[in-house]
Amino acid sequence: MPVSLHLHDTRGLAVANAHAGLKMGVSQFDSTVGGLGGCPFAGQPKAAGNICTEELVLLCEEMGIDTGVDLDALIEVGRMAEEIVGHQLPGELIHAGSLDAFRRRAAA
């Protein structure tokens, strides 16, 4: 039976919790591009959205788990989402870029 996790990043621990989940065999995660979302109706008006899809993909790829996702293209989608909503999203990779992009620049 597949186990899934639904993680928010309110305290900055979503990636760490996803890492622990992956090591325990979790195979499905709820995530959002750029970390969209939140939970203001639950009494936390500054609650963060779900774990960022792009950060989850990066974690998987760095752990040797093939996702089949083009991370650079996904980061661009996150940047587009930020433009559409009209404010900065909490996702780190949409601002920093992927490790592969960094490695390509460093090797050039």
Task: Go through the PLM ranges and name each one.
Residues 1-108:
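Catalytic cores and adjacent flexible loops of soluble metabolic enzymes
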